[in-house]
């Protein structure tokens, strides 16, 4: 699996993830890019789960963003509907964490589109560790969203055997 963490704080949203890909008990790649920008750099997305499945979902999600002119929530709901009802898509095993300047969502293969509490999203095998670390930093420091994501992922990589310390981190800043 992996760790994907998103923090929304002070007009900034950040999604970061590690780069480890495993096959059974073996690390097969250490620098997979599990976080990407989509829709002309207006949306960021990260995935946890099967790499091939996730890349398929990234492509489908970007098509939905184009179809619905970048409306994040509508695009996520339409992707979740297709994911849940299509015979082939239903077999894809991955989770997506997506965000634009205003909204953050988790999209699952069960058709769930979840808006997270506390402006935090954490998915994957190390998600709970990263979430706990991020909450502690939000409540007890004045770090930026990007600094929190970096430090929480670093902490997680020292605990979760399916998370490494090669990170991809993307951010969006809102003027509002």
Swiss-Prot record:
Allosterically activated by HslU binding. GO terms for biological process: proteolysis involved in protein catabolic process. The active site is at 2. Keywords: Allosteric enzyme, Cytoplasm, Hydrolase, Metal-binding, Protease, Sodium, Threonine protease. InterPro entries: ATP-dep_Prtase_HsIV_su, Ntn_hydrolases_N, Proteasome_sua/b, Proteasome_suB-type. PROSITE patterns: PROTEASOME_BETA_2. It is found in: Cytoplasm. GO terms for cellular component: HslUV protease complex; proteasome core complex. Its main location: cytoplasm. It holds the Pfam family Proteasome. Its EC number is 3.4.25.2. Na(+) binds at residues 157, 160, 163. Protease subunit of a proteasome-like degradation complex believed to be a general protein degrading machinery. Belongs to the peptidase T1B family. HslV subfamily. PANTHER family: ATP-DEPENDENT PROTEASE SUBUNIT HSLV (PTHR32194:SF0), METALLOPROTEASE TLDD (PTHR32194). This is ATP-dependent protease subunit HslV. It comes from Buchnera aphidicola subsp. Baizongia pistaciae (strain Bp). The gene is hslV.
């Amino acid at each position: 699996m992996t760790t994907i963490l998103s923090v929304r704080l002070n007009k900034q949203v950040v999604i970061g993830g590690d780069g480890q890909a495993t096959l059974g008990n073996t690390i097969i790649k250490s620098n997979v890019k599990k976080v990407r920008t989509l829709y002309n750099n207006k949306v960021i997305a990260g995935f946890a789960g099967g790499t091939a499945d996730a890349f398929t979902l990234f492509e489908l999600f970007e098509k939905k963003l184009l179809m619905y002119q970048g409306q994040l929530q509508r695009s996520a709901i339409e992707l979740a509907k297709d994911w849940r009802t299509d015979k082939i898509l239903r077999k894809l095993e991955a989770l997506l964490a997506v965000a634009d300047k205003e909204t953050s969502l988790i999209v699952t293969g069960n058709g769930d589109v979840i808006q997270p509490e506390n402006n935090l999203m954490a998915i994957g095998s190390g998600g709970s560790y990263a979430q706990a670390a991020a909450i502690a930093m939000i409540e007890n420091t004045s770090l930026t969203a990007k600094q929190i994501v970096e430090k929480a992922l670093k902490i997680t990589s020292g605990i979760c055997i399916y998370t490494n310390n090669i990170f991809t981190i993307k951010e969006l800043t809102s003027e509002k």
